[in-house]
Amino acid sequence: MEREGKSDPIPIDIILDILSRLSTNSIAKFGLASKFCGSILRGQDFIELFLITRPLSRPRLLFAVQNSDKWCLYSSPQSQFPDENHSLVVSADFHMELRRDMGQEIFGLVSGLLYFPNTRTGEVPVICNPSTGQYARLTQRSSMNNLSSLLGYDPIGKKYKVITPSSSHFDPENILTLGTGKVAWRSIRCLVDHYPESEGICINGVLYYMASNKFQFSGVKIASFNVRYETLKFLNADVDVTFCPALAKLINYKGKLCVLSCLWDNQIYPKPLRWKVLMLWLWVLEDAEKEEWLKREYTLPVNIVHGNVSVVGVTATGEIILSMDYTSESFFVYYFNPERNTLEKVEIQGFEGSEKNLSSRVYTFVDYAEDVKFI
């Protein structure tokens, strides 16, 4: 029997099936092996197959700890029913280390990717996949102005876009689409020049953020940018909603935009107690078309929340999650159920000693799940 000189190529569907069963770290290494491998893993067919073949896992909390010389990423289980009987101490799993020069701050976890805007340093923005460790530095814009940039995601077209809202007519390059093979800034026309005053939150393909422009409108407004159609509008909201962007955070509240402010108040209880309590104010955009807002106000139970904390998000069932801002000997995450008015404190162990004798900044993100998107 004569042996043929060439064997038949392996069908692409078999290759996809084999790759989908690898760990995320192995997938990341395979994607760097060649352009052919990378093109397979960037394809939507592989991404969808990966999600199908993986068992459904509960969402997790992702922690990005900013040490002096590196970023350290951890994750821990995200409690599903924090006001029921469960362990109040959970361990954080170490994921990976990232280079410190990737950025000074993180502007959100957007559909599985971390975004380092690098506005303060003037460096180009960086996008990173915390599941694989893969990252990409964006191309430099022709303008050298240190403009704030934001990352949005179009779930229909499955495209990420970076926008740099400008307050100058002399800075035309303001949008970058990723994953097209043509990494170049281009121009879209915004009817009103403005400057972002907050991080953004992308909900169902709409990127929301607070914006200002002292020359064209007073105060701060909420910008609404449709990532797919690249259209911009400003929402009508009471001045109470945007009175202080530094204290407010835009979050996804059960699929709706919510502006949440938290503030310590020691005037509620009379002397000599003067206990500090944490007040939460929520403005939920109940009807986006009519721009109708619903205000809610909560007082968290006394003497449970300690230290510098921030609201980091809301679970699918409506629990508001607060997290400490810096590492310490004991690090806590808090789950507040507004319907039951319950507050549970969960200790996170595993990264409290990531850098001895230093208090490191911690960025916490909710609903984290493994993702193999390649940039």
UniProtKB/Swiss-Prot annotation:
It comes from the Eukaryota. Residues 5-52 form the F-box domain. This is Putative F-box protein At5g52620.
